[in-house]
Amino acid sequence: VGEVFTVFGGVMLAGFLGITQPGSQGVTVPLLATQLLWINLLTDAAPALAMGVDPSTDDVMARKPRKLTDRVIDGQMWGDIIFIGLIMAAVTLIGMDMHLAGGLFTDRSVDAVGHDAQMTEARTMGFTILVFAQMLNALCSRSHDQSVFVGLFANKWLWGAIALSALLQVVVIYVPFLNTAFGTMPLSAGAWVECLGLAMVVLVASELRKCVLRAMRE
């Protein structure tokens, strides 16, 4: 749901974030359709398949049996999904805003590079942040309440899927004809640091949530 909240939030807050098209009265979307399709195919499908062979946790036999009436996705899980989705959207839009003129967190000028180039850079930033945030969330989602660092390297298939996804994301950003297809542009080393730093917020938020759950249970 991270991409859903990103698109919805980007459209609703476009004026505050600088996600606008000069001279146009239409809606300017934060991410393109091809980018959203890439996110769904790349960061959702491969890690999800790899998580299907994730080893069981050590405390699986200590858990209470589920009731026949229990839902597969209960209220608490929906809350977790919405919470992480909102965090993903927030860091994605903040990353975009940092590279747009007229936003909340920057005083950049459009004249320096031109609006189209600036929007492409911002979209590439948001696109990349969301991809890496989804990968980190896949690691965090291995357990509902255990830290991501417990058995971190137990699932080699998941790490393989993440490595492949990261490599393909780099290809989309640096191969010229894919730049045209996906509306991306090469990023600087500093931009990569920003992307990874903002994506890490998802992992930190997930770890804090799990700490609270463990404290409440004890």
Model-based region annotation:
Residues 52, 101, 128-218:
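C-terminal transmembrane module of polytopic membrane proteins
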Residues 1-145:
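Membrane-embedded transport module
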